[in-house]
Amino acid sequence: MSSISDSFTRINFLYNINDLKNLISIFEYGILSKNSLIKKGIKNYTDLSNPDVQERRNNIRVPNHGFLHDYANLYIDARNPMMYFEINNKNINELCVICVDKKILDLENVVITDRNAATELAQFDEPENALRFLDFDSIFAKSWNHPIPYIKNELKAKKCAEVLVLDKIPVNYLIKIKVATQLAKENVEQLQLNVPIEIDKDIFFQ
């Protein structure tokens, strides 16, 4: 019997962009939502997100339940505007992408958005209904540049289509880690997380 995740044939993994310093915590507790981090009292967590964006996300209600900060978020494609921002504002040796099994889509309390969840036009729905609005050609496009500003903004938002998982993404769904450099790979290897680590320059715009 096929599962919901099987219908997402264009997706191999889902992705979480993170800081290497968070990996020990992540592989102990899972990828936690902002509010779950607070509840667990985890304070030594390096937050990559823009504070202004997070303030906006904190007030956005998810139709199914709660607010965006109640959900751990994943991207359908990690080679996106957030990644582009991070590589231009942070040491690339400190960045990683955690590849998450798409079977996470089969769990309850999972929501998919057709674009950055913090944008006004974002559509939210359960995985079984989300294929109707996902624009995979835009999500997986190599570029979101366009001479017409409003189209560029639309493409940029769609590149950041999200999968939202209530509270946390369990450790057993974390499949492998991607990094940009040999140095980053060696630093992750020292953590002994027992998952494959690979260098993927393309996902980091290298």
Please identify what each model-predicted range represents:
Residues 1-206:
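Active-site-proximal loop/hinge segments that shape catalytic or ion-binding/gating pockets
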